[in-house]
Regions:
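Internal alpha-helical transmembrane segments
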Residues: 22-23, 34, 69-142, 287, ...
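Terminal peptide-recognition signature
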Residues: 24, 62, 110, 149, ...
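Functional transmembrane alpha-helices
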Residues: 88-101, 196-200, 204-298, 317-334, ...
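PDZ/PDZ-like groove recognition
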Residues: 119-156, 168, 258, 354-357, ...
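Conserved PDZ fold ligand-binding element
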Residues: 149-172, 335, 394
Length: 395
């Protein structure tokens, strides 16, 4: 029976993840059609087609691997279409005849649909009477004597105001800064009743099983029981908060003194899948909250100005609009190939590291549970949540 329940939740997670990718591709698809561009195929899933039907020149497919999907638009991305279709000739001449502003709109449409889905999910969650909202405050509940925090003089009741010079209001923001700091000594400014603001120098400790950094199992008082990944009931305020947290991690990746620790906290498909599975199994509302945040991540990451991502297509289209000429096809091809190799290599490394991390977490479950306090989720989940925005934070 347990196996059937597990299979059920896995199927649900696959469907939710596929929804996020499919809605992204649908954005490209519908805008391309409305602009009169040639669309050859729209597929739910990858690999061999299990079912297909051609309607008005577009072949609709249901493919064997139910993880996302793709849309084939030769006029906008001939090289990408060539790869997806498994051969054939890239129609670069057709692309040259398409106005750059149309390419721009098609490229933006995918991430825009992810944002729309995130807002819709946030609105749905905000309208559910039983849903609770609110974030754990950055207030210390208990300080184990053997940890770095206790050694630095932190006490129960302290309210953390800043970490490493960055203001924090919530437990999540505090944990994000701890992960980015890594093993470097960082200054915490805390407010203590009867004393006021005081600085504390703390060096985070790394858990060898999960790979996460902690100032030693600090527990937060007054847990809210709120929907995971959505502390604010307002969809727009929550969207702004999400964007800020994601850009904070991206900034950490390109900041020399933060890059190493930030990259160690990142996770790929395995950790994201585990995070989604755990949230869905615990509470359907938490699953929707995680899916909402995942869509914001997909939108922002796809807009990065990197060839092979939507942001790369946007960058090339803007170049053509500003300078009245296109980036040479050979340059686009070489850049796209190079970055595809880099991204696939990084993805492979993340999958290997995540799989090893997941194995250690599951084979040392008792040790992992001890590394965090009772009301903060298990260490493995904290790491998953902390890396889901390749991705971002620990709850």
């Amino acid at each position: 029976m347990d196996i059937l329940v597990t299979v059920f939740y896995i199927v649900v997670c696959v469907m939710l993840f596929s929804l996020a990718i499919a809605i992204h591709e649908f954005g490209h698809f519908i805008v391309a059609l409305k602009l009169g561009l040639r669309v050859e195929a729209f597929s739910i899933g990858f690999g061999p087609a299990l079912w297909k039907k051609k309607v008005n020149g577009v072949e609709y497919r249901l493919s064997a691997i139910p993880l996302g999907g793709y849309v084939s638009i030769p006029d906008v991305d001939p090289e990408g279409t060539k790869v997806l279709e498994g051969g054939g000739k890239a129609d670069a001449e057709a692309k040259a005849k398409i106005p750059a502003w149309k390419e721009l709109l098609v490229a933006v449409a995918g991430p825009a649909m992810n944002v729309v889905l995130a807002v819709v999910l946030a609105v749905v969650l905000s309208l559910i009477p039983s849903a609770k909202f609110g974030e754990l405050p950055a207030k210390i509940g208990e300080v184990p004597a053997e940890g770095p925090a206790a050694a630095a003089g932190m006490k129960a009741g302290d309210v953390v105001k800043s970490v490493g010079g960055r203001a924090v209001r919530t437990w999540t923001e505090m944990q994000t800064e701890v992960q980015i700091a890594g093993g470097k000594t960082v200054e915490f400014v805390v407010t203590r009743e009867g004393v006021g603001d005081m600085p504390l120098k703390i060096t985070p400790k790394r858990d060898e099983v999960s790979g996460a950094w902690f100032i030693m199992a600090l527990s937060v008082t007054n847990a809210t029981g709120a929907v995971a990944w959505m502390p604010d009931r307002s969809p727009l305020r929550q969207l702004a908060w999400d964007a800020g947290s994601i850009f904070r991690v991206l900034k950490g990746l390109v900041t020399p003194r933060e890059a190493k620790a930030t990259s160690q906290a990142l996770g790929g498909p395995v950790m994201i899948a585990e995070g989604l599975y755990r949230q869905v199994r615990r509470d359907p509302l938490d699953g929707l909250g995680f899916l909402r945040f995942l869509n914001v991540n997909l939108a922002i990451l796809n807009l990065l100005p990197i060839p092979v991502l939507d942001g790369g297509l946007i960058m090339f289209a803007l170049f053509a609009m500003v300078f009245r000429r296109r980036v040479p096809d050979c340059v686009v091809k070489y850049l796209s190939t190079a970055f595809m190799v880099i991204l696939m290599g990084l993805m492979g490394l993340l999958i290997i590291r995540d799989s090893w991390r997941s194995y250690k977490i599951h084979t040392h479950k008792d040790e992992v549970e001890k590394c965090q306090s009772a009301e903060v989720e298990k260490c493995g989940e904290s790491v998953t949540n902390g890396t889901a925005n390749a991705t971002s934070q620990a709850r």
